[in-house]
């Protein structure tokens, strides 16, 4: 008698079949994350292209914002809903639009459509990096690094307006619209003097500096086995092997600064840490602005400048500029509020 020892073959369910199809080796990997990424990215990009091409902002901001109205690439935008809409999701079938697509576009429904699908698309892209890292067998630091721009997007476009009175105070999706939002942030929140913004700038510019230094150092220390060292003819662009010297790079920077990275792991972790931490700090700062937390205030300088016409600092100058932004921007930016500022309340510098 023959006895066969082994496990009984389990029946493959629908989950296994779908899993196999999603993870099949193809030119563009789909994966489970692709079920979130591709539809959301397609809808967000399509909504933005539709809005910038055809949809006006007359009913929400009193502005022209589409190619159809004569704007160019730098001035088109998908504008935020009107302040009166509050934090409504503005669903097409909701009480505001009532299934009317034209009305939905006019009241700013495309902005919430693009914002939420865009956020989900970015999250899907991060999950895609996690999924592929697991399948390939590498660490998920790419996905962790990508969490930084996701944090910035979510904090600026979603959390900040949730802390304010409506979606109206979020940035509209357009180049000039983002610039207007930056001026708004400075005038109403003194954003450049916020310590979290300072850390964000240090992280982004520090990351750019590290990237430039790293690339230049690798180019400087290239060599090719079997031939004389040459920076400019040291390698073929398609070669597989590494042909730069970490030892030489370490010696070079040790002579310049007195210190240098001792190994590639610490060097590349630092290049990851600096910009990612900077972006996360900036995101935390924006969450603080959603709660109307203040930046640095140097009251003693403001008090002395108010009492002494000859005393003025760059800080007090900036405070006056912020007051000017608020006074001149509010009537333009929020015409529905019908602000009126008499000339005597508009800010003036001490030299005027």
UniProtKB/Swiss-Prot annotation:
InterPro entries: D1/D2, Photo_II_D1/D2_sf, Photo_RC_L/M, Photo_RC_L/M_CS, PSII_PsbD/D2. Keywords: Chlorophyll, Chromophore, Electron transport, Iron, Magnesium, Membrane, Metal-binding, Oxidoreductase, Photosynthesis, Photosystem II, Thylakoid, Transmembrane, Transmembrane helix, Transport. The D1/D2 heterodimer binds P680, chlorophylls that are the primary electron donor of PSII, and subsequent electron acceptors. It shares a non-heme iron and each subunit binds pheophytin, quinone, additional chlorophylls, carotenoids and lipids. There is also a Cl(-1) ion associated with D1 and D2, which is required for oxygen evolution. The PSII complex binds additional chlorophylls, carotenoids and specific lipids. One of its GO terms (molecular function) is oxygen evolving activity. GO terms for cellular component: photosystem II; plasma membrane-derived thylakoid membrane. It comes from the Bacteria. Fe cation binds at residues 214, 268. It is a multi-pass membrane protein. PANTHER family: PHOTOSYSTEM II D2 PROTEIN, PHOTOSYSTEM II PROTEIN D1. Belongs to the reaction center PufL/M/PsbA/D family. PSII is composed of 1 copy each of membrane proteins PsbA, PsbB, PsbC, PsbD, PsbE, PsbF, PsbH, PsbI, PsbJ, PsbK, PsbL, PsbM, PsbT, PsbX, PsbY, PsbZ, Psb30/Ycf12, peripheral proteins PsbO, CyanoQ (PsbQ), PsbU, PsbV and a large number of cofactors. It forms dimeric complexes. Photosystem II (PSII) is a light-driven water:plastoquinone oxidoreductase that uses light energy to abstract electrons from H(2)O, generating O(2) and a proton gradient subsequently used for ATP formation. It consists of a core antenna complex that captures photons, and an electron transfer chain that converts photonic excitation into a charge separation. The D1/D2 (PsbA/PsbD) reaction center heterodimer binds P680, the primary electron donor of PSII as well as several subsequent electron acceptors. D2 is needed for assembly of a stable PSII complex. This is Photosystem II D2 protein. It comes from Synechococcus sp. (strain JA-3-3Ab). The lineage of its organism: Bacteria, Bacillati, Cyanobacteriota, Cyanophyceae, Synechococcales. The gene is psbD1.
């Amino acid at each position: 008698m023959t006895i066969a020892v082994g496990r009984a073959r389990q029946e493959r369910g629908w989950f296994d079949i779908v899993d196999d199809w999603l993870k099949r080796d193809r030119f563009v990997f789909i994966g489970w994350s692709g079920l979130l990424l591709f539809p959301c990215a397609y809808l967000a990009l399509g909504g933005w292209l539709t809005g910038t091409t055809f949809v006006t902002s007359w009913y929400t901001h009193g502005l022209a914002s589409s190619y159809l109205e004569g704007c160019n690439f730098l001035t088109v935008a998908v504008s935020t809903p009107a302040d009166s809409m509050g934090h409504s999701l503005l669903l097409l079938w909701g009480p505001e639009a009532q299934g009317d697509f034209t009305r939905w576009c006019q009241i700013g429904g495309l902005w919430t459509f693009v914002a939420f699908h865009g956020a989900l698309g970015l999250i899907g892209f991060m999950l895609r990096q996690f999924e592929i890292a697991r399948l390939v067998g590498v660490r998920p630091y790419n996905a962790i690094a990508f969490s930084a721009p996701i944090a910035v997007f979510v904090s600026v476009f979603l959390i900040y307006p949730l802390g304010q009175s409506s979606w109206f105070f979020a940035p509209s999706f357009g180049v000039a619209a983002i610039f207007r939002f930056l001026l708004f942030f400075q005038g109403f929140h003194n954003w450049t003097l916020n310590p979290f913004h300072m850390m964000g700038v240090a992280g982004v510019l520090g990351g750019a500096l590290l990237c430039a230094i790293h690339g230049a150092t690798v180019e400087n220390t290239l060599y090719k086995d079997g031939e004389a060292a040459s920076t400019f003819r040291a390698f073929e662009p398609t070669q597989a092997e590494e042909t730069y010297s970490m030892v030489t790079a370490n010696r070079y920077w040790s002579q310049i600064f007195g210190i240098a990275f001792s190994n590639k792991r610490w060097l590349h972790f630092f290049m990851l840490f600096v910009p990612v931490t900077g972006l996360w700090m900036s995101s935390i700062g924006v969450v603080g602005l959603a709660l109307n937390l203040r930046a640095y205030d140097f009251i003693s300088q403001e008090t002395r400048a108010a009492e002494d016409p000859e005393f003025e600092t760059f800080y007090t100058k900036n405070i006056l500029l912020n007051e000017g932004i608020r006074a001149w921007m509010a009537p333009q930016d929020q015409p529905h509020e019908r602000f009126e500022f008499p000339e005597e309340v508009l800010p003036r510098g001490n030299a005027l």
